[in-house]
Structures are given as structure tokens and as C-alpha cells.
Amino acid sequence: MSQYTDIDRLAVSTIRLLAVDQVSAANSGHPGAPLGLAPAAHVIWKQMRLNPKNPEWINRDRFVLSNGHACALLYSLLHLFGYDMSIEDLKHFRHLGSKTPGHPEFELPGVEVTTGPLGQGISNAVGMAIAQANFAATYNKPDYELSDSYTYVFLGDGCLQEGVSSEASSLAGHLRLKNLIAFYDDNQITIDGNINVSFDEDVSKRYEAYGWEVLHVENGNDDLDAISKALEQAKLSDRPTLIKLTTTIGFGSLNAGSHSVHGAPLKADDVKQLKVKFGFNPEESFVVPQEVYDLYNKSTIEPGIEANKQWDALLDAYVGQFPELGAEVKRRLAGEFPEGWESKLPTYTPEDSAVASRKLSEIVLDNVFDTLPELLGGSADLTPSNLTRSKGAVDFQPPITGLGDYSGRYIRYGVREHGMGAIMNGISAFGANYRPYGGTFLNFVSYASGAVRLSALSGHPVIWVATHDSIGLGEDGPTHQPIETLAHFRAIPNLQVWRPADGNEVTAAYKVALTNKHTPAIIALSRQNLPQLQGSSVEKAVKGGYILQDVDQPDLAIVSTGSEVGIAVEAAKVLAEKNIKARIVSLPDFHSFGQQSKEYQLSVFPDGVPILSVEVLATSGWSKYAHQSFGLDRFGASGKGPAVYEKFEFTPQGIATRAEKTVEFYKGKQVISPLNTAF
């Protein structure tokens, strides 16, 4: 006998028709997947632990719609389950300024992550599952289980075809993340037509090879009991589970099973027959029977609110039993760092020895790692090069492997840069003040640009430790030497891109990156040693740009970043011998500098002083700050780092020569600062 009633089936039909009505009202959107996935959504959400009155409750279950184009389904669920999503909001689907944008966006209560670029959501979900396992292993005690939530995911064929999902799913299998349950919408349709035009692999065997539990629901269109049974079985597994859910895209539509129902509104006659088929009045839209509201209120909302109350009481008891850990949990849930943590940050003087900035980064991480338990680090198989693993760190690994445990805070991502980026977004989205950081070579952050862009769009404050930041890496040559990379990432809104020149600037980069709650950061670091510079300080560098060394009435300003700043300082000495006075400006982060007042920016780059930028990467983007740019608008070369710098004339004399030409060119001309603009 089925555990589901006619009211459950009415609820499924309600979900379907709310999604269809949204798409029809907007005359835009994707009705096909919501029609096919509504039964699974009903089964999952009905048993989820959630509290719509406290959507950020840390021990809630999480739902990720990786196939974000099906967002009309998610918005319907948010309305039905009591979140801040009204029928009027649904009627404004895809309208400018609405709560119902064309793909789910992170800031909306109940939306766990921004999805749309396929494959990102399932990868974010892996990150959430990692964070939950780590939080549980760190704080759970006998009789005090603070964390035992699940992460559920919907994904489609498109997600599975994107490489990022393979990277993340492979790692999830290795890590045996049993709190992760994914539903694969096996509807056999893509935008181009039947899936067989491009995709005929055995997804089940693929995920079995990853180390996942794989189950199959043959009739995902209306077999609620089979879906529920698969879900119960998944919860018994000691591994992540993929439930292959065979559905019909556009179920109930006249065009069901066709690619035409994927991304276009149903025609009016189709909508009417669909409503008749599901027992609704064909002349009415956005209808929710009271029985459906009552069903979800009784099955999910009221129990969720009560579970949250019980959890709050459990936390209070936990604080009494484990005062130190309890205070730490409360601090993290409040999104705060420990008082005085900044005292752990190192500072430097010019008398200190020259050190590679990747090593300076390691020193910062070593100093703060024990103080900040929310740091969850890792590297894409470059730990010895990135220097990202702190002394005494334990690896995040399944205990069964003997390689670490789930309380470990260092993740071996393998050669999976894109997966790492998307997983870090999920770790951040989990909450509890998690601050993930991941290491790779700067050039290979480009592999993960899709995830980096979503970090910035969503405001996930993840940190990329991006070493080997220039031709200075030497012998590995142009395949590994970044050229366009910084210009690309600097163009992304809400993204810090640091290229520190010495120890104080490395410290400043981490200080700003860690204290900023809504902006991710890439910290580009050198392989070669860099001197500690006269005039640098953490206090100046946190502004993103500052005058490192100044002169009275400068003939020009040389602005630079990273390893070239020290060379620019030497170039100024060459120029001084020719009676040319150069102001030296260090600009480690365009974004942070852009946050300063216009008055401050113009004090660094005033009218009347020609500006030459020097950076051994592409010159694109430098016109914002400089009149002339000396950079590398070609690929690098293989050889010893100093020899490669010499080849491309990034030497004191090479910079001085271009500085002289800049001074000569602007002599007698009115020089307006590039920052002195109309708006």
C-alpha cells in the first residue's frame, strides 16, 4: 500500500502547474524539467529538515538545483514551503528586480547557491557535503550531535557533460561523502535534440567507478513510492549516492519527450489541456489548493521549526558542557573571527631577507591556521609548490583510508582546478564562517574561471593561492607562464586580484581577503625571492595601492605590482643619476584601490605627472591608471627566470629607458591623471 495519498498527487500537480504558469506569465523560461522533476521534488522536500523562518539554520538540509534553468520548480517549492516567496513573486518570474530571476541567485532565502552554468551546482554540493562532514567531525560529541544534515541535488545531462562535475564527483567518491544524495534527471533530451546525438555513456557505471552508490528509479514521472524507497536506501549508504531518475521532459504536455518543451513556454492550448489533465480549472492560473499548503505545513514546516528549537536548546546545553568549543561554534555562526587574530599576522622591515612571496604566504597561513578553525585549505596536487599545507595540519580524508579524518582541514583536491574552485564555493555557502583556500599555479586558475566568476557573483569569500605568477617561474616556459590571466580576472566585478611585492603586502592581501565577507580573492605569488621594500607597510598596502617611495615634484610615477616593484625601485636609482625624479607606486590590488576615495586615488596619481605602468603580464586594463604601459603582450619563454626577465628587458635599465621616453613624450604637455574623469 502506498504511503502517498491523493493530496500528495495534488501537491505534485500543483508544483508542476505553478512552474508552467510562471514560464507562461513571463513568456520565457524552461517548463520541461520542472514537469518531469516535480514528483521527486515533492518526495525530497516533504522529508527535508528546514525552517523557512530561519533559512540559514546551520543544521538544515540543503537542496541544490544544479540544472538552474529549471528554477521555476525551485521558486514553486520555496512558495509552498513557507519561504519569503509570494504568489505575486511567482507572477513576476524573470522580471527585472524580482525575487524570481531567470536562474537561481544565492542571496534569495532558500537558494543555497547561484546556479545556471551547468555542472557548478553539483560541484558546489560536494563542497557543502565536505563542510558538513568537517563541521560534524569537529564539534559533534556523544549525545550532542550538532550537525547531521544532508545535501540533495538535482542535475541533468548537461551537468554531467561539463567537466567540472566529473572533477567534483570523482573527489566526492574518494572522500566517501555519505551525506550527499544526487538525483540525475535522465530525460534523454538536450537542446540539440535526443541525447544520443552527443552523449551515450553509461552514467551509472561512471558513477560506480567514482565510488558512488548508484540507484535507479525507472518511473520518475509518478512513482512516488519508488522515489521514496530509493531515498531511504541512499541514506543507508556509507558513500555518496546518485539516483538515476528516468523521467519524461515536459510530462503531460502535448510535446512531452521533445526538445521543444525544454526552453520555451507551452502554447496556450497545451497549458489548458495540461490543467484539465491534472484536475485544475484551465481558466485559472497560480492556483494552490489549501490542502497542499496544509500538507506541507504539517509534514515539513512545523516539524522543521520545532527541530530548529530543539537544536537551539541542544546548542545551549553543548555550550554548558563544552564551554570552549561551544563559544567557538557560536562565534563562527555569528560570522566573526576570534578577537585579536590579526596579531598573528607577520610584518617585515627592509632589513629582513628576500623571500619568495609564495613562502611569505606559507608563513601567514602557518601563523593563523590554528587560530582560525574555519580555514579549510587545499591544493590541486601542487602542495610542495604552492606551500599551502600548514605545519601540523591533518588531511580531510575518510578515516577508513588511514590518511586523515573528517576533522582534517587540508583537502587533497588532485589535479582538479575547476572542481576545486566550485567545491570551495560550496564550502563557503555552507556557512559557519568557513573560509576555504586552494592552491595552484596562477596560470591554471584560468581552468577554474567559471567557478571564480560565480564566487564573485555570489559573494563567496574564497581565496586562491596562485603561485608561479609570471615568467619568473622560468624553465617550465610559456605553457605555465601567465600573461593574460590577471587582466582577465581583474575585469571580473567584485574580485580582489592581489599581486603583492613583499612580505607586508602579502600580509595585507590575506588581511583584506579574510576580513572581507563578500568578496573572493586571488593572491598571485612569486616563485623567486623578493626583497622587503623600504616604504611598504601593512597599513598602506591594505588600501590596494600607495606611494612606496616619493620625491619632491616627480617627473613621472612608475606604478608596478609584485616582483617588478623591486625592479622599479632600482630603476628609479638609474633615473636619479640622469636627474629624472620618479615616484614609485605599488598597486597590489586594483579592486581594493578602487574602493578608496577619489581624493586618495588622485593623491597617488595626481594631475601633472605622467604615469608608466610596469608589469610582466599583459598590459590590458592598465590604461585605467597609467598613460604608458610596459608589459608583456606576447607569450613568455623557457629558461632561467632571471634570463627570461633579461630577454624581455624587465630590468632596472629596461624600465629606466621606457621611463625616459615617457618623460620626454609628455614634456611640455598638459598631463591629466587617468583617474581624473567626468564620472
Swiss-Prot record:
Residues holding Mg(2+): 157, 187, 189
InterPro entries assigned to the protein according to its UniProt record, in alphabetical order: THDP-binding (IPR029061), Transketo_C/PFOR_II (IPR009014), Transketolase-like_C_2 (IPR055152), Transketolase-like_Pyr-bd (IPR005475), Transketolase_bac-like (IPR005478), Transketolase_BS (IPR020826), Transketolase_CS (IPR049557), Transketolase_fam (IPR033247)
Biological processes per GO annotation: pentose-phosphate shunt
PROSITE patterns recorded: TRANSKETOLASE_1, TRANSKETOLASE_2
Stored Pfam families: Transket_pyr (PF02779), Transketolase_C_1 (PF22613), Transketolase_N (PF00456)
Chain residues that bind thiamine diphosphate: 69, 116-118, 158, 187, 262, 417, 444
Cofactor(s) needed: Mg(2+); Ca(2+); Mn(2+); Co(2+)
UniProt-annotated catalytic positions: 417
Residues at the site labelled Important for catalytic activity: 30, 262
Keywords for this protein: Calcium, Magnesium, Metal-binding, Thiamine pyrophosphate, Transferase
The UniProt record lists the keyword Transferase: yes
Coiled-coil portions: none
Cellular component terms (Gene Ontology): cytosol; nucleus
Catalysis: reaction(s): D-sedoheptulose 7-phosphate + D-glyceraldehyde 3-phosphate = aldehydo-D-ribose 5-phosphate + D-xylulose 5-phosphate
Taxonomy, superkingdom: Eukaryota
SUPFAM superfamilies for this protein: Thiamin diphosphate-binding fold (THDP-binding) (SSF52518), TK C-terminal domain-like (SSF52922)
Cofactor annotation remark: Binds 1 Mg(2+) ion per subunit. Can also utilize other divalent metal cations, such as Ca(2+), Mn(2+) and Co(2+). Binds 1 thiamine pyrophosphate per subunit.
Single GO MF descriptor: transketolase activity
Residues binding substrate, per UniProt: 30, 262, 358, 385, 468, 476, 527
Family: Belongs to the transketolase family.
Function summary: Catalyzes the transfer of a two-carbon ketol group from a ketose donor to an aldose acceptor, via a covalent intermediate with the cofactor thiamine pyrophosphate.
Subunit structure, as described in the record: Homodimer.
Designated name of the protein: Transketolase
Classification of source organism: Eukaryota, Fungi, Dikarya, Ascomycota, Saccharomycotina
